[in-house]
Each structure stands twice: as structure tokens, then as C-alpha cells.
């Protein structure tokens, strides 16, 4: 049995050839994500996972478990799977059959731990579904016009903002909430292992907390905390009930519920400086003198870098550009400037979780 990747250097060539290949890969950048989206919808990755650790299945074995009678399904699936194997999303090996044909077998590469359900039932597959959602993709077709004429691409495409639209479309509301909930769960699981700043808090408000998955995880680990999940009424109406968590509907730009501490996760990046200052001022006013705001957000490096982590935060910044009113990534210095302008005296960055930094904004500076 041979490895598919043993042959990966056969297509090598001159520097110009490599540059041309890179250009074609960039030009076709949406294809792997759309193929991955289809495989997730077909439940292919979960089928392979259920076969056991290290298992590899042939396209025929996978198709046998799909609700299809399409005679071409195996060939189509093979072509989709080998594309993702070339991106190291899947592993691939080959075996020669008795009739001389070569058959490819596919397994899950390490990155698939994020595209299949984890122990919390969370998966970045929900983010694949959201980012490749037709409504979201349509925003990119208006990016050029937004540069020339101003405005937000999503609003140009849909006639309203990405926060207004879910109220008119229950299906998209579910896709949006699912994406945010799954993403939050994955980040929060790691954050709770690294960040110790929840210790000693009596009451914690998760601002723009969605359906409450994150605050539930915090309260589950710190059961003495009274958790409050704060979000817009149309968001929390679908929120499940959690022990120790109260769902409160409201507008964070008008006021927020009083508590010892506030948690703001990947929310400031959605808004302009003006909106962020208004939100942070509401938090400041609702905190006791010894209170703090815990901000978990992506932090941009001062200059572009080529690491996967840097690419991720710049991709997120581009997503903000296309979909959110004034949304943008910020450097550490820009986050601190917002906090100081509102009146927070202390600013610390105790840790990071995946591509996000945890920042603490203290109302009064610790002595």
C-alpha cells in the first residue's frame, strides 16, 4: 500500500512554474471550502471518524452509507476527496486491486479534529457552513463597489445589515447562531484551560453571548458564578435553558446588566471605534470599582506576517470588512487606546487561546 503523498513532488518544476501554480491555487481559492462544505453536508467526515481511529475508507465504502443510487457518486466523491487530501485535510493511501486497478483510501488528517464533532458536540464545520452560505458569499460581489462608493458589502447585497437580516430569515438565523455557538464552544474549551481570571467572580455577564453556550461552559467550571447571557431578544428566544444561567434580552449599546465582570468575545471586532466606545462605556458604568471586562478578540500584528495564525486574523479582518458595519481587526495598542479613552485604568493581556488574545480591562488600576 503506497502513500498518495509519496508522489506529491512529481509535479514540481521551475520557480516560474511554482509561482504559476500558486497563482492558480489563489485564483481557485473558494473551491476547497465549497468541496469541504459538501462533504460536511454529506456527513462524510463523520462517517470516516465512526470507522475508528486511523481508519481509511474507499469512496465505494463511503457511498454505500449514503442515501444515493447515483452510479457516478463514487467517482465524484473520489475526486472531491483527493482534492482535500492535496490540501492535507484528509490522508490518502493507495492499494492495487486484484484486477490491477488502483484504489484510493481516505482518512482524517489531524486538522479534521476541528471539522468533526468534538466532546462538546462542537465543530468548525458550522463555520464552513456559515462562511460559504450563499447570503454571506454574495457580500464579496459588492466589495469593489463598497471601495468606490462606500457602504457595507453585505448591506449592499441584502438591503440590511448582517445583524438585522436574521430577524427576517429564520433559516439564516439558525445558520448564523450555529456558527457562532460552535466557534465559541471550541475557543472557550481551550480558553478555560488557559485563563484563570474567572476565579473569584460572583456575577458574570456574557455580552452578545448568543444562545449561551459560552457562559454555560464558564458556570459549569465555576459553579459559584451567577451567569447572565445578554443578547438581542431574537437571539436569546432560541437559547436553551442552562443551570446557573439567566438569559436577558437587551441592546448592549443602550445599557448592559450590572455584574462583577463582563465577558466580550469576538464582538468588538464587529463594530466601529464609535460603537466600541459606547459599549465599553456602558460596561464601565455597570461595573463596581473593582470590576473588569474580559475581552477575547483577535489581535492584528503591526505588519503582515505569513504564518497560519497571521493569515487567520487577516482573513477575519477581511470578513469584518465585507459584512459588519465598521467592523475591523485591531492591534493590541488600538485595543488599549479604546479602553483608556473610556476610563479603564488597567489593561493586561494574560494569555491567548488559538488565534485570540485575552485582554483584561480593569475599572481601577490594581495596586
UniProtKB/Swiss-Prot annotation:
Protein name: Tyramine N-methyltransferase 1
Applications reported: An heterologous biosynthetic pathway of mescaline is reconstructed in Nicotiana benthamiana plants and yeast cells expressing Lophophora williamsii genes TyDC2, CYP76AD131, OMT1 and OMT11, thus providing a sustainable production of phenylethylamine-derivated natural products.
Record bears the keyword Metal-binding: no
Residues bound to S-adenosyl-L-methionine: 231
Transmembrane helix keyword on record: no
Keywords: Alkaloid metabolism, Methyltransferase, S-adenosyl-L-methionine, Transferase
Residues annotated for S-adenosyl-L-homocysteine binding in this entry: 184, 208, 231, 251, 265
Native species: Lophophora williamsii
Effect ascribed to mutating residue 324 to A: Increased activity toward dopamine. Reduced activity toward dopamine
Recorded coiled-coil stretches: none
Organism domain of life: Eukaryota
Function: N-methyltransferase participating in the biosynthesis of natural products derived from phenylethylamine, including mescaline, a natural hallucinogen potentially used in psychotherapeutic treatments.
Metabolic or biological pathway, per its Swiss-Prot or TrEMBL entry: Aromatic compound metabolism; Alkaloid biosynthesis
Subunit structure: Homodimer.
Matching Pfam families: Dimerisation, Methyltransf_2
EC number of the protein: 2.1.1.27
Catalytic reaction(s) noted: tyramine + S-adenosyl-L-methionine = N-methyltyramine + S-adenosyl-L-homocysteine + H(+); N-methyltyramine + S-adenosyl-L-methionine = hordenine + S-adenosyl-L-homocysteine + H(+); dopamine + S-adenosyl-L-methionine = N-methyl-dopamine + S-adenosyl-L-homocysteine + H(+); N-methyl-dopamine + S-adenosyl-L-methionine = N,N-dimethyldopamine + S-adenosyl-L-homocysteine + H(+)
Entry GO MF terms: O-methyltransferase activity; protein dimerization activity
InterPro entries: COMT-like, O_MeTrfase_dom, Plant_O-MeTrfase_dimerisation, SAM-dependent_MTases_sf, WH-like_DNA-bd_sf, WH_DNA-bd_sf
Class of this enzyme: transferase
Amino acid at each position: 500500500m503506497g502513500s498518495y503523498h509519496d508522489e506529491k513532488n512529481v509535479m514540481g518544476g521551475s520557480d516560474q512554474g511554482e509561482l504559476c501554480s500558486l497563482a492558480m491555487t489563489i485564483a481557485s481559492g473558494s473551491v476547497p471550502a465549497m468541496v469541504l462544505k459538501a462533504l460536511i453536508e454529506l456527513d462524510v467526515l463523520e462517517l470516516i471518524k465512526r470507522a475508528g481511529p486511523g481508519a481509511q475508507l474507499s469512496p465505494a465504502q463511503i457511498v454505500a452509507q449514503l442515501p444515493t443510487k447515483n452510479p457516478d457518486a463514487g467517482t465524484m466523491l473520489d475526486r472531491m476527496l483527493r482534492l482535500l487530501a492535496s490540501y492535507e485535510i484528509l490522508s490518502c493511501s493507495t492499494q492495487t486491486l486484484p484486477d490491477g486497478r488502483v484504489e484510493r483510501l481516505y482518512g482524517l488528517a489531524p486538522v479534521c479534529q476541528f471539522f468533526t464533532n468534538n466532546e462538546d458536540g462542537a465543530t468548525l464545520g458550522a463555520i464552513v457552513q456559515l462562511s460559504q452560505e450563499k447570503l454571506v458569499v454574495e457580500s464579496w460581489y459588492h466589495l469593489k463597489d463598497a471601495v468606490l462608493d462606500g457602504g457595507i458589502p453585505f448591506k449592499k447585497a441584502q438591503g440590511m445589515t448582517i445583524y438585522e437580516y436574521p430577524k427576517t430569515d429564520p433559516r439564516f438565523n439558525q445558520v448564523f447562531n450555529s456558527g457562532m455557538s460552535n466557534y465559541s464552544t471550541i475557543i472557550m474549551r481551550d480558553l478555560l484551560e488557559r485563563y484563570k481570571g474567572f476565579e473569584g467572580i460572583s456575577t458574570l455577564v456574557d455580552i452578545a453571548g448568543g444562545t449561551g453556550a459560552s457562559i454555560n461552559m464558564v458556570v459549569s467550571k465555576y459553579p459559584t458564578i451567577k451567569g447572565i447571557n445578554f443578547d438581542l431578544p431574537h437571539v436569546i428566544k432560541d437559547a436553551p435553558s442552562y443551570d446557573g444561567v439567566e438569559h436577558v434580552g437587551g441592546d448592549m449599546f443602550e445599557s448592559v446588566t450590572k455584574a462583577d465582570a463582563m465577558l466580550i468575545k469576538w464582538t468588538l471586532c464587529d463594530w466601529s471605534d464609535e460603537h466600541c466606545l459606547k459599549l465599553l462605556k456602558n460596561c464601565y458604568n455597570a461595573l463596581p470599582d473593582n470590576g473588569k471586562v474580559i475581552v477575547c478578540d483577535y489581535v492584528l500584528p503591526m505588519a503582515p506576517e505569513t504564518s497560519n495564525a497571521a493569515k487567520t486574523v487577516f482573513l477575519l479582518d477581511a470578513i469584518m470588512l465585507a459584512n459588519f458595519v465598521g467592523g475591523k481587526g485591531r492591534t493590541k495598542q488600538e485595543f488599549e487606546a479604546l479602553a483608556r479613552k473610556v476610563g479603564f485604568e488597567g489593561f493586561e493581556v494574560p494569555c491567548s487561546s488559538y488565534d485570540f488574545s485575552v485582554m483584561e480591562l480593569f475599572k481601577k488600576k490594581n495596586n
